[in-house]
């Protein structure tokens, strides 16, 4: 039984899909006017992992993640660069895919662009106007929040107490400060489409509601995104969607927490961000994913070079274990398991059970990773050159099986690990000959951090995994 923390009801709930065995999931994607930063990257990695885990547990997942390709920021960027909004969108959608692929983020079932749904959006807006939930002023159309009885139920805020916030534009023409634009009249130099209210373009909130309804249906299983979208974006999506259809918009709302730098949220507005591409130039995707999944997705995560280095060492330790098993598969002479090995392999299932228990509990990736470390500690100790090829192969398959939903530990290290370790041992031996004991100790400690212990014997230096 999978339990998820539902932001809407402020508690963990058993996940029961609308259709048995299927998950309809919508995740708010990027506004494509720049490279995405690693804070956005955490959101994409988290919900990619959740999608993968549902699939691992046997669900068919319809996974929709949109591109916002018409927006104030995009218009500003296009004007600055003397190009069109469409060209900006085309460019950064391509760049998104390049970075997301590099982070081993699986492609969505559909990545809709808002501009591909203008006709549907106009119908959606008209439906709200016809029902009395929206009103037109000088070509702009606003949603009347006071008309929707449940406004504020996601964020837990009372509409009477809400004030115009930083992300809510103040406009004297609105009937209430909390009303928000679902259609915007054209301004000079802006792209626009013909509508019953004149030339204009959609508001941000209406885009996601419309695309989710069109691609997944009036009610979906999961709507997800970063916690900064909870209000007003997701609150507004609920209001306009449920006002139009009269049905619940999403049964479960999931929100990933911020990535912080120096205890402040990473954001482009604070100019304290690192793009995913910048980090990918220096660290492998497994390292970045490991860091992003090393804390529960609802916990804020601090980002620093030290934490990246720590994640790198942890990933190397797991790949060392993988490499050790790959080498054993090539080197051991006995093919099949004996009865004792079959019993030992069966005992390894406790790590899989622990992993599933933790992931079933609101996708606790941090504890799931701990279960993988416990597994490799066991295999490092008990699978040796005297073991069978079959046992080493089965253990390797189990490590990869548990790594797959996390999007990690799938690469082969064949030939690389042993050569790298032997080279470091040779370097250490030379340092000792040169009486550079500081360097020799540093190499020994570096190997130990990676789970490799050196033993000085009369026959020379030997190494083993721990």
UniProtKB/Swiss-Prot annotation:
Cofactor: Zn(2+)
Motif ('KMSKS' region): 265-269
EC number: 6.1.1.16
GO cellular component, one term: cytosol
InterPro entries: Cys-tRNA-ligase, Cys-tRNA-synt_Ia_DALR, Cys-tRNA/MSH_ligase, CysS_C, Rossmann-like_a/b/a_fold, tRNA-synt_1_cat_dom, tRNAsynth_Ia_anticodon-bd
Keyword line: Aminoacyl-tRNA synthetase, ATP-binding, Cytoplasm, Ligase, Metal-binding, Nucleotide-binding, Protein biosynthesis, Zinc
Main location: cytoplasm
Pfam families: CysS_C (PF23493), DALR_2 (PF09190), tRNA-synt_1e (PF01406)
GO molecular function, one term: zinc ion binding
Localization per record: Cytoplasm
Catalysed transformations (reactions): tRNA(Cys) + L-cysteine + ATP = L-cysteinyl-tRNA(Cys) + AMP + diphosphate
Comment on bound cofactor: Binds 1 zinc ion per subunit.
A Gene Ontology BP annotation from the UniProt entry: cysteinyl-tRNA aminoacylation
Motif, 'HIGH' region: chain positions: 30-40
Binding site for Zn(2+): 28, 208, 233, 237
Residues reported to bind ATP: 268
Subunit structure: Monomer.
HAMAP family tied to this protein: Cys_tRNA_synth (MF_00041)
NCBIfam families tied to this protein: cysS
Assigned protein family: Belongs to the class-I aminoacyl-tRNA synthetase family.
Name the record gives this protein: Cysteine--tRNA ligase
Species assigned in the record: Clostridium perfringens (strain ATCC 13124 / DSM 756 / JCM 1290 / NCIMB 6125 / NCTC 8237 / Type A)
Gene: cysS
